[in-house]
Structure formats: structure tokens, C-alpha cells
Amino acid sequence: MIKGCILPWIHLYGDLQGQYKLCCHIPTKDSVGTYKEPISSIFNNEKYNKIRNQMLSGGVPKMCKKTCYDIEKLGGISNRQQVNKRFGKFAKLQDFTSKDGSISNDPIYLDIRFGNKCNFKCRICGPFASSAWFKDANKISVFKNYPKQLEDYYTDSQDFWDYLQKIKKSVKYFYFAGGEPLLMDGHYKLLQWFIDNNKTDVELTYNTNLSTLKYKNYDVFELWKKFENISLWPSVDGYKSHCQYSRTNFNWDIFETNLLKVKKYVKTVSCTTSIYSMLTTPELIAHMKSLNVSTYLSTLDTPDYFDMRLLPKNIKKHINKKFNILLKKIPLNDGEKENILSNIKYLNNNIEDENTLLKKFKSYNEQVDHLNHTSFVKTYPELAEWYETI
């Protein structure tokens, strides 16, 4: 049985700001190192070792509490639960932890972000993760202090490539996300590196917006053919107009066309459940099922002013009813049902500081609506009365 979370024993994550963290859900302030340090020194540094020992003794690192443990208490499925299930076969590695918390194995699973280049301006995102936000970020109050330039600390880092060469025998999994990975030079450079180094047995997983399958002179399909295991998790937050509203520059027809082109690689589409997406998530699941594609619901953990628990009780009741109909009409496997039920359970909870968070949500959303010439109440007429009273 895994104590705490398996990631500190197998995983190294380098984020968009050049910070190393336990995983992509951890705030930047809780990094375990930076790009200025040799990457080879991170996996067994003092912070990593302390976290391992804390987990082995039954403790919960403060940085993990909100992002995973609090979600679990409310019935949601956390990243910790997901990775423990996926990588449970590596649980034995915990038994070989030294007294000081260090381990002898190299990372098995890498998540290195090759920059914040992206063509979408999602409302639950920002300039820290999307270059498309740069132009307008100063017009949105919460983004004024964020960096507004392309950041890529790894594509041209000799330190990273030397380290990868050193640990290549250990690396079994690589996760690509963004920004938008299919628009990143580092992504294609890494694919070619794996090919040149006879490492095509590595399992590649993507979170992609599927807005384009062409970049410069690269042919991603020809590259993918050389790998044994490709798994795509295309991101789609809500159904049609709701997704297009919350993910500026998203086009449903393009998404579905490209989804069908890459269908053989698709593990599941991924929907982040939030104020913006939850109302039409049942329709999304049903439509994807008609295409013989599964949908995974990932509970949003930040920013908390987009949390779906902020939705009014009558809308929560309406969403519950829609899901009940869905569960009766659409054939779903046990994993899909569990995923849906956990999100419903999370939705039905109350949230602390509700009024404060709602005011933050409306203030932000009004600014983006003004910028995009869009209307929340026209897109979500069921929420119009509630929205106007915030």
C-alpha cells in the first residue's frame, strides 16, 4: 500500500517558470528547486527527502493538503488518487527509502514543460501558462503582476539534455502539457531525441487542445508512428457554446474534426469541472460516448473563485437531475460512473468564503467579457438571475 503519494519516488516536474515541484498541482511558492540548480541535484535534495520521510511517517505535506487531500474529503478524485492508481506497481520503491529520505533510483516519470506558448485564452488560465494572454493581460486586474513573455527553461538547456541522457534507461513515462505542446519546439526536439536514442518504448501522454495538428515542418503522425505507446487526453471544458465561451479561440468543429483524426491515440477527453463547464458536462459525456470516446472529469482545484461548489442550489439540483438521467440512459463502465459520482458529490458541498469568492469570480468574468465582447448571461441563461445578484 502506498503511503501518501507515489510521485516523490518516481516523478520529476519542471514547470513553466523553471521551478521544480512535486507535481503540476503544487503552487510555485512550494517548489523544491529551480532551473538555476543542476537538475541532477533536485530529486534527492533536502526538500524532496524531507517530503518523502513525512509521507512515510503518515504526515501530509502542507503543499499537498488543498490540492489533493481537501478534494478527497469532499468526495472529489484528487491527482494523488489518480497517480497512486496508475503507478501503484512502483509502491515497493518506498521500502528502499534511506533514513534521510533519499532514494537510489532515478526518476521514472518526467513532466517537463517546454514553455507557455499557446493559442487559447482560457478563462481558468492566464499569461503564466498561455502566450495568447500576453496582449490583453494588463487589462485584467489579477494578471497585472504576472510575467507576459515566452518562458522556456528546458528546450535549450544543456543541463536538461545531459541529465536526460544520464537517466534514459530509467525513464518510462513522459507527460506533455502546456501551454499547448503541439505548438512547442521542445516537444518535437524531445520526440526526435527519443527516436535517435532508441527510446521509443517510453510511454508518451499528452494534454492537448487539439486546435492544430500541424506545426512548422513537423509531421506529428510520422513521429508518433515510431513510438509504442501514445496516449492523448484532449481538453474540452463543457459542451459546444459553453466550452467556446470559457476557452477563447476554441472552435468545436475543429476540435471534433481533429479528435476523429487522432482517435486511435485518444485515451479519454479531459474536462475540468468548474462554474463554466459543469452545467453541460452531461451533454459532453453523452456526445463523446456517441463517438465511442470516454470523458474524464477533473475537479478544478485553483483558482478557487471558479469552483463549481459556488453554483446556486437550484442549479446544482438541475445538474444532479441531468446526471441521473445520463447514468440511466448511457452505458458507462464502473470507472466512468465512479468519476461522475465523485464530481457530483464534490459539487453538492458548500464552500467557505462563498460571497468573497463569488465577487472575485464576477469581477474577473466581467473584465474578460468586456475584453472578448461576450456575455455570461446570454451564454448561460439558466444562471442569469443568480449572476445578476452577485
Question: Where do the PLM segments sit?
Answer:
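N-terminal pre-core extensions flanking Radical SAM catalytic domains
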Residues: 1-151, 167-169, 335-390
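Conserved C-terminal portion of the radical SAM core fold
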Residues: 17, 205, 227-236, 252-389
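Non-transmembrane alpha-helical segments in soluble domains
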Residues: 40, 65, 122, 165, ...
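Core AdoMet radical
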Residues: 107-117, 128-156, 169-185, 197-216, ...
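Alpha-helical packing segments of well-folded alpha/beta enzyme cores
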Residues: 110, 160-163, 167, 190, ...
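Eukaryote-biased activation of long, low-complexity terminal tails and linkers
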Residues: 143-158, 169-174, 190-191, 196, ...
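Leucine-rich repeat
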Residues: 162-167, 191-197, 221-225
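Distinct, well-ordered alpha-helical segments
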Residues: 188-192, 215-223, 280-284
